Amino acid sequence: PLVDGLSDFLQSKGIKTFGPSQAAAQLEGSKTFSKDFFIKYGIPTAGYSSFDDFETAKAHLEVVDYPTVVKADGLAAGKGVIICGNKDEASEALKNIFQDQTFGEAGNRVVIEDFLQGEEASFIAVVSKDKIVPLATSQDHKAVGEGDVGLNTGGMGAYSPAPIVDARMHQKILDEVMEPTMKGLINEGSPYLGFLYAGVMIHNGELKVLEFNCRFGDPETQPILLRLKSSLVQLCLYAIDNKLELYESEWDKRHSCGVVIASEGYPEKYLSNQEVEFQELHSDSMKLFHAGTTLENNKVMTSGGRVFCATALGANLKEAQTAAYTLVHSVSFNGAFCRTDIGYKGIK
């Protein structure tokens, strides 16, 4: 909706709106736009080339190093990124995107980019033109399988804070990524308002931007919000009025962990319309976030690939992880599955 101009439309009707303009939302809406923007404003990112036809893209596969990364240019529900170990896999990815149109119009153009080594982290902030309030750091798990293997998904779980983003790295991301992005968008005539999510790869103390999202991430939002003690609504209102300096962030010092409960088959064709059963757990430090569910005849039914995010707080990440899986086990439906290692990078 943001890429389609929802924020612009609401503001044109005099409605207070928290969210970037159609022009600014291109940071997420087009990977080619975002990569070109990174280069223009000196924001560190992987080397890349973009293509709008199959044959030219396929010819480029002869000159890239493997593994390489093939990305659908547009919005693809978090599934448009394919890591390819060799030329055959990359060629198949291009065929799926261009010829089979797996991602529809999002695949009218592709970006082929260098594969980056390192550890990913999510850096989410509220931005209002030239002002910024960083939120708690987090790390998600995109691959469907334990140990980060298998197909990419929208995210199978997340935890907060992310130990890899220490104080030095936090400042480095602000200085090298967020500040240049804010200033660059102002320079482009599209000052930013809303959540700005930078997915970064960190390796040997250096960073590169993988992607931008113009929204809270899912499933990072759930563990982050479980730790936020100050008002999210007030934060958004201050951003709309360009008064972020008045906001005082307050965070729970505990760690949080969120585990996605998914439907059998996800991230490909998945089982749906299954009745969900719950065992009651009463705890202020746990929260079951619904995602792919509907209510039919007073019964909760599954309706999506990612169905719930079981999220919990703990004195440390291990305790938060244990509590989150306790909550996972209180939910059951036919075909339910989850990764059993969410948070492992932060516990190692």
List PLM regions with ranges:
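Internal nucleotide-binding/catalytic subdomain
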Residues: G80-T221
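A short, GP-enriched loop/loop-strand-helix hinge that lies immediately N-terminal to
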Residues: P1-G29, G42-F51
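Generic C-terminus detector
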Residues: T293-N297, T302-K348
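Active-site "cap" helix and flanking loop/linker of ATP-utilizing ligase/carboxylase catalytic domains
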Residues: L174-L196, N213-S285, E296
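Conserved anion/nucleotide-ligand pocket segment
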Residues: D65-N86, I224
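General beta-strand structural signal in soluble alpha/beta enzymes
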Residues: T17-P20, G47-S50, T68-A72, I83, ...
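Short, charged, surface-exposed secondary-structure boundary motifs
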Residues: Q26-T32, G145-E146
